[in-house]
Amino acid sequence: MAPRAAGGAPLSARAAAASPPPFQTPPRCPVPLLLLLLLGAARAGALEIQRRFPSPTPTNNFALDGAAGTVYLAAVNRLYQLSGANLSLEAEAAVGPVPDSPLCHAPQLPQASCEHPRRLTDNYNKILQLDPGQGLVVVCGSIYQGFCQLRRRGNISAVAVRFPPAAPPAEPVTVFPSMLNVAANHPNASTVGLVLPPAAGAGGSRLLVGATYTGYGSSFFPRNRSLEDHRFENTPEIAIRSLDTRGDLAKLFTFDLNPSDDNILKIKQGAKEQHKLGFVSAFLHPSDPPPGAQSYAYLALNSEARAGDKESQARSLLARICLPHGAGGDAKKLTESYIQLGLQCAGGAGRGDLYSRLVSVFPARERLFAVFERPQGSPAARAAPAALCAFRFADVRAAIRAARTACFVEPAPDVVAVLDSVVQGTGPACERKLNIQLQPEQLDCGAAHLQHPLSILQPLKATPVFRAPGLTSVAVASVNNYTAVFLGTVNGRLLKINLNESMQVVSRRVVTVAYGEPVHHVMQFDPADSGYLYLMTSHQMARVKVAACNVHSTCGDCVGAADAYCGWCALETRCTLQQDCTNSSQQHFWTSASEGPSRCPAMTVLPSEIDVRQEYPGMILQISGSLPSLSGMEMACDYGNNIRTVARVPGPAFGHQIAYCNLLPRDQFPPFPPNQDHVTVEMSVRVNGRNIVKANFTIYDCSRTAQVYPHTACTSCLSAQWPCFWCSQQHSCVSNQSRCEASPNPTSPQDCPRTLLSPLAPVPTGGSQNILVPLANTAFFQGAALECSFGLEEIFEAVWVNESVVRCDQVVLHTTRKSQVFPLSLQLKGRPARFLDSPEPMTVMVYNCAMGSPDCSQCLGREDLGHLCMWSDGCRLRGPLQPMAGTCPAPEIHAIEPLSGPLDGGTLLTIRGRNLGRRLSDVAHGVWIGGVACEPLPDRYTVSEEIVCVTGPAPGPLSGVVTVNASKEGKSRDRFSYVLPLVHSLEPTMGPKAGGTRITIHGNDLHVGSELQVLVNDTDPCTELMRTDTSIACTMPEGALPAPVPVCVRFERRGCVHGNLTFWYMQNPVITAISPRRSPVSGGRTITVAGERFHMVQNVSMAVHHIGREPTLCKVLNSTLITCPSPGALSNASAPVDFFINGRAYADEVAVAEELLDPEEAQRGSRFRLDYLPNPQFSTAKREKWIKHHPGEPLTLVIHKEQDSLGLQSHEYRVKIGQVSCDIQIVSDRIIHCSVNESLGAAVGQLPITIQVGNFNQTIATLQLGGSETAIIVSIVICSVLLLLSVVALFVFCTKSRRAERYWQKTLLQMEEMESQIREEIRKGFAELQTDMTDLTKELNRSQGIPFLEYKHFVTRTFFPKCSSLYEERYVLPSQTLNSQGSSQAQETHPLLGEWKIPESCRPNMEEGISLFSSLLNNKHFLIVFVHALEQQKDFAVRDRCSLASLLTIALHGKLEYYTSIMKELLVDLIDASAAKNPKLMLRRTESVVEKMLTNWMSICMYSCLRETVGEPFFLLLCAIKQQINKGSIDAITGKARYTLSEEWLLRENIEAKPRNLNVSFQGCGMDSLSVRAMDTDTLTQVKEKILEAFCKNVPYSQWPRAEDVDLEWFASSTQSYILRDLDDTSVVEDGRKKLNTLAHYKIPEGASLAMSLIDKKDNTLGRVKDLDTEKYFHLVLPTDELAEPKKSHRQSHRKKVLPEIYLTRLLSTKGTLQKFLDDLFKAILSIREDKPPLAVKYFFDFLEEQAEKRGISDPDTLHIWKTNSLPLRFWVNILKNPQFVFDIDKTDHIDACLSVIAQAFIDACSISDLQLGKDSPTNKLLYAKEIPEYRKIVQRYYKQIQDMTPLSEQEMNAHLAEESRKYQNEFNTNVAMAEIYKYAKRYRPQIMAALEANPTARRTQLQHKFEQVVALMEDNIYECYSEA
């Protein structure tokens, strides 16, 4: 594509002129708001807007940097650098406004001074060009006489080269005005620029500039009579300037590339008026010439020639300049090669319309496409204002060569002229050069010795290719034998037309880019991806996808759309761009639109009709159309519902392909639809997992034909479209004639036995008669037994009368209706529903005279129907011999309507009554109005009840009664009148041609007749008629043209009523602008609508699309102004606005013309939009809610307004105090002043202060009124009362203070005593615990003493802590018995640790499927899409996410480096999502798959640290907690203990426990007796547990016997022993509850001998102690003790009771005792071993810091939170709370509570927020409040040490991870994990497939096909296999 340059002129002069002066363009929305409103994509047909960037100021130019993927956008006062892909802002620079004057030199000119005032001036960009060779962006604006800057490529905000360059004072740089005056210095003057590449061996780049002259004498020069013109001498119209920044900077922007004025083209001063040049574009062609080829620079421009010039001279010009080529090429002067020729775009086929003004050009490879428009004001401009023409560059070249030949060889003054009269040239006219042979280069580029510059007088002509109104820009691409043309419009739309090779339009589409904003005349394709087009409107930059092919779902639609870009991707069965289709470069893989729909894949199935009862070996498929060879591909025939059979392709044949396919199994045939004898089956050929072509075949069943058509069974069988045969004897339809018996059978439908139609007389109800039924073709069933059926349960016998007649005997039918028709059919006797054919069914009518005939006329009138009825006090049946009754009574007329009619007659008169004739003939000539006959209408006559007749003409006005004569005469009470209606006038007499005008026609007697018509122009009805006696109102239809039309009033479709009525259709009203364009969301703001011809508007309303509430009614002020209250809206947004004028939707005529190009676009958008913003908010100045005011005093309110963007004016505010208005005096942006000038009333009261804006009302305060005397009295009383209260309070305070002092001293003494006791208790407890723990530490064997879980059990417990979709975790162990060593091995089981249990029959397929699925999971693209697809499902709960993450960790455990890369990618997505909201909340919970993956990754990586460093101090802390708890009393029922860290588990009773040292032996253990310490308050179960702990302390807990599995026996003496139990007959009962037995209860002394033994059968009489019912049992404390009131029973009153809170000091005691062990643990966790640094932590923390830096997150608190959430809170807190994940121990509820307190302290230590502690703070936070600051320092030091570690490379980390994988390989069965992951894949298979289809990489690598293969392998038997397993 050739680079081009755009001028900085306004986008459209027509658009600029459309707005009248009072309505200037309103301020634009700020960028963030517009981004919110406009970033959504819009789509229409085959165009799709991908991205938009809104500009607050009008846009001027843009440039593309294809190599860097950058867009540079220039707007008024701003420069933007945007990302090319999404138009996001990368950099920006402010370049205005600046103080400037067009009469002053640029301030960059040294010693420049100016006497004229400089005013703040906006900077309009004129040139924006990229110079990639020097890394520059050339930016020229309208300020400072068109000054240019050289900015840095890649950073538009930085200036790359300072110009003029700075120089030392000793050597000043010479700067001339011509170096500064580059571009035009007026906003509306055009400028184009083009960076010319340097010639080989030459210097730097050059800049070609074309600029409209703005100096003295032009319309752009200031009209101040100043002659000071800096433009003429310094700014030529066309010039080539230096851009060489690597050479002498002092020569930048100079002309002197060669020392001659010929290097510029400057129009002479005297010729400037006649040659005003307006530049459109500058471009190179060819843009990339081959080496040695000539390249040209072109300028497209308009020459505004004045009247008097030659009529034939074209106004649109194309100028060409030669550029140097090759190393030896000389740089020619500009004027040497300059030549211009006219471009003329004129209508063909006899149309003389000329499009003379050039608007936009686009150079294609062979053609120059140009948009032209007619001059403004042309009479035809409204019909077709713009056209597209195409000129061949070859024709341009030929015309130039011919012109130079005509100038120098054989001069022809009518062909070419020298521009010497216009510019400084080399001679006034062409002259013949003798003895000179012009070389081709001279013919193309001229020479110094030849006349120049030249102008070709005859224009190059072209016929319009396309016409449309308001075209502003063009871009063209040649694609797939089509030419795709994109056209911008003045109304902000983009048209896309596709031209064939003959340049004829074959399709068109329209999309709205920014309605109402003209599209800039330059559009460019993305250099990196031609599938996108960049364009610019007045306030937006847009990136448009050239085609949205995916809107077409079939090949026919895709190819038939004739879109140059779209084609059918055969093997992917979708409409795509060619580059989006795999293998599209190969033949037949991609079918373009140019190939036509006939090349679409098609298929024929043979046989196409299949008998359901016949066996078929297979199907033959003939596949035609554009398809690659299917031979060797994986193929199947797909019948739907997952039914597929194998297909085979032997090879191509005769231009198509043949395939063979097995028919689907018979048991899988689809069911036949109801009442149908066939079913159509759609069969598709499936290739590589996709159905690429389909066809239908039919399965038929002849036997169903007879069932579907039972009354024409034989006829339907033999006339069916299938080969069916009729068996007469079986009365059945078969597909094989051999199934019929040998008897003769009919062979054609005409031979079928059938009943013949025979008319039957009506039968009275209940009568008996015989019915004869004639038959035909009876030879096939002569003599067969038949029955007569009438559709009832009752069947009548049929008797053969002869060979062709059957009689139905004694048929009796009944009905309760007036009459009822019964169908008559013959069926085979004893074979229901087997009927003889009845092609024309016989029927029997049964009537009932007693029903439906309330009067005589109706009764006797039934005789015409064959009903034998008579009238005798009612309608009755008469016998066949009874005579007819006589005449009926005279007619009775109840009502007539209407009561009047015109003299011409024709009125439909309706007469209602009784006995109005028995038949029409009775009254046919018997209806009269006076002496005028009224003719009844047969089709409107109702026997006896109603007559509708047409009145005849009357000789004159008359009035008479209506007479009906039906053998007797009846007359009406009302009179009917003949009158003469007249019309006089109509109003209004004019209206818009859009229709909707409500007119009123005045006259007399206009209410007459039955039908009224008002016709406009004799054809179009005036609708919504309403009439009175003197007027008719109706709504005018739409008119075709502005013209007068006659209006005709017709009564009864007769002639027009006399009176000449004329209505004038006028041009429609035009709306040009609305202001303001912002409204509060509540609506009601007055919107002023400006336009023309509003005097014809009767009513107008305003409605808002999508978010608007009810439309609002507007008010017409005059012919140019309308005011409308803005409608309320549902939300804050920008929405299109519609106006309804006279009930018709307003439409701009130009927009309507555009919409006709694409009817879909007619429904899109509106020209006007309203931006809805939040309602304004107000308050009083001091935000008080009550304001006091004394009547008589002046009242001035100061109201504060919150800042908003509504731009409200002072008259839009209404402030009221009660019902009194407050006059607004001062309004600023934030403050409103108002005052009240009238009295508010003297009565004391309260008045609301309300402020109103539109429909929004806000009460901001209440005004309190009161008298001044009353206020003084009230103040005195209040002060007196306050003084008295102060004295009393002072006395009370002194008394209380003395008492409090005494109490405080007493309390201090108590606290000192308590503190002393606590210190002593801690000292003793710590000493004891240290002694015990020292002994324990000595006993621990470093390798075996700590019961660490194996790695695999650590992993399963950590990954699946509670339950997952895989299994519900239960650590259930078999019954254990101690062996001689006192231990029993019981291995914990888990599905992931065992074999994959599936039956052998299923194993091969499933193992292959799992293997393939494993390879998919090891594909990064698949796994990322897979995880995201599942997480998007609403029913994919957190539990499922965690389960999936853990299963993935197990499945990928052998590839931790790959697992880590996946986790990082998912984390990046999570960080992106969190960074956009609140980054500090990231990783706070575990709610996504990646968060659980991170937990698992940390668990794996930290296991070694956990086991080698943290495990021992952690285990010692657990033992210390247990030892400390066991030193005091523990309530076995409630679990509460004397010593604890948790307030909830504190035993708040002072129960003294004494230790007992017991000598215990364990029978069968093989160990000596041990001394075990217990407390005398221990229950026997607690004693057993302590004994078991003593004997099994070096054995894992899972191998311990349980307390209920052993008995404890006390040997009180050598002869006495007792089995000790918690409950027995000796248990004590208190308050109805049994107390558990303790050592004290049994009075077991110190040193007692006990024996413990295993029991064979567990005693189930007593369950777990803590599960006992507290209503029946207790241990230490009755359940009511802790909740009881101070009053107790006498029996309990001896207990010493104190406040329960006093025992909270024991928490401190326990904490102090355990402090050392806790400190050791925290230091182990938060320290770094030099020999084994935490590589994973360093790696992950560095990753977090890198991500934060990428997103500009510099807050250290955020990084601290991320690190804390990822390691301490995610891993260590989990371990601290769950020691059973690490050790094989018993975690009791009490230990769990203590660990929760410790974990909370760890969490607080990692937090950065200060602890807000008070008296109500929980004890678990207060307990370690003093230590938290020290712990925090340790945490921060740990983070700092991690940060200071040497960074890890990816290779080092991968090596570490690989080592971790190797260390624990083969620990888990990954097949089980894969199978469980597959269950999720199966559950969400459609969603996963859709996600894979939507992912380009997945489509390219066919991941969806591989996934389908997994499903195919797994689906057939996975569930059966699992059920068997």
UniProtKB/Swiss-Prot annotation:
Region (Disordered): 1-23
Membrane topology term: Single-pass membrane protein
Short name of one Pfam family: TIG
Intrachain S-S bonds: 104-114, 140-148, 322-445, 345-389, 549-566, 555-600, 558-575, 569-581, 637-661
Cytoplasmic domain ranges by topology: 1293-1925
Keywords on record: Angiogenesis, Cell membrane, Cell projection, Developmental protein, Disease variant, Disulfide bond, Glycoprotein, Membrane, Receptor, Repeat, Signal, Transmembrane, Transmembrane helix
Extracellular-facing ranges: 47-1271
Glycan attachment points: 86, 155, 188, 224, 481, 500, 583, 696, 736, 802, 965, 1017, 1060, 1099, 1118, 1132, 1237, 1257
GO molecular function: protein domain specific binding; semaphorin receptor activity
GO BP term (any one): regulation of angiogenesis
Composition-biased stretches (Low complexity): 1-18
Transmembrane segments: 1272-1292
Classification via SMART domains: IPT (SM00429), PSI (SM00423), Sema (SM00630)
Places the protein is found: Cell membrane; Cell projection, Lamellipodium membrane
Tissues showing expression: Detected at low levels in heart, placenta, lung, skeletal muscle, kidney, thymus and liver. Detected at very low levels in brain, colon, spleen, small intestine and peripheral blood leukocytes.
Transmembrane helix recorded as keyword: yes
Domain IPT/TIG span(s) in chain numbering: 891-979, 981-1066, 1069-1160
Gene3D superfamilies linked to this entry: GTPase Activation - p120gap, domain 1 (1.10.506.10), Immunoglobulins (2.60.40.10), Phosphatidylinositol 3-kinase Catalytic Subunit, Chain A, domain 1 (3.10.20.90), YVTN repeat-like/Quinoprotein amine dehydrogenase (2.130.10.10)
Stretch forming the signal peptide: 1-46
Main function: Cell surface receptor for SEMA4A and for class 3 semaphorins, such as SEMA3A, SEMA3C and SEMA3E. Plays an important role in cell-cell signaling, and in regulating the migration of a wide spectrum of cell types. Regulates the migration of thymocytes in the medulla. Regulates endothelial cell migration. Plays an important role in ensuring the specificity of synapse formation. Required for normal development of the heart and vasculature. Mediates anti-angiogenic signaling in response to SEMA3E.
Noted disease: Congenital heart defects, multiple types, 9: An autosomal recessive disorder characterized by congenital developmental abnormalities involving structures of the heart. CHTD9 features include common arterial trunk, tetralogy of Fallot, interrupted aortic arch, right aortic arch, ventricular hypoplasia, and hypoplastic left heart, as well as other vascular and valvular anomalies.
Subunit relationships: Interacts with NRP1 and SEMA4A. Interacts with SH3BP1; they dissociate upon SEMA3E binding to PLXND1 allowing SH3BP1 to transduce downstream signal through RAC1 inactivation.
Family according to the record: Belongs to the plexin family.
The protein's name in its UniProt record: Plexin-D1
